[in-house]
Regions:
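Hydrophobic alpha-helical transmembrane segments of small proteolipidic membrane proteins, enriched
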Residues: 7-137
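Cytosol/matrix-facing juxtamembrane amphipathic
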Residues: 131-149
Length: 149
């Protein structure tokens, strides 16, 4: 029994370490791609980020479920609100005189495209974490079955 408990502790530690390394690698890869191609500052827009994160939060609260479901719903809500933010930005561009001034279309479109970027980036991170949570739940169920038999 003690050996099984010790083995589980070691495996859980390595599982959490691999999750940490994976998330750091994903974030590093995205930041590296941003830095290699352009100015880092153009990828940050506070209102766009708030729309995506707040929308994802309220989406996960409304959808309900257990912790894994809420985390998965947070990622799904981030993608959906990312696209809603994009559509809102395009509608705002179309309603204003920005279409007439061709010099302003590029920067305005870049800001509008940030919301789907944020949404998918959050979805990737939450997807990795949800998969790990599902894996941990499966391992716990298998361990309980072994202990019962």
């Amino acid at each position: 029994m003690r050996i099984l408990g010790l083995l589980n502790l070691i495996l859980e530690g390595s599982i959490m370490f691999s999750l940490f390394i994976g998330i750091i690698g994903i974030i590093g890869l995205v930041i590296g791609a941003i830095i290699s191609g352009s100015d880092f500052g153009i990828f940050f827009d506070a209102p766009a980020f708030v729309v995506v994160v707040a929308g994802a939060f309220f989406y996960s609260v409304a959808a309900g479920g257990d912790a894994v479901d809420r985390f998965e719903n947070f990622g799904n809500g981030a993608v959906r609100f990312g696209w809603l933010g994009f559509l809102i930005g395009i509608i705002m561009m179309s309603a204003s005189n920005i279409i007439i001034a061709l010099d302003n279309i590029g920067p305005a479109l870049a800001v509008a495209l940030l919301t789907p970027f944020y949404g998918y980036f959050i979805k990737i991170l939450t997807n990795v974490i949800v998969n790990r949570m599902d894996y941990n739940k499966l391992i716990e169920e298998l361990n309980e079955e072994k202990l019962e038999s």
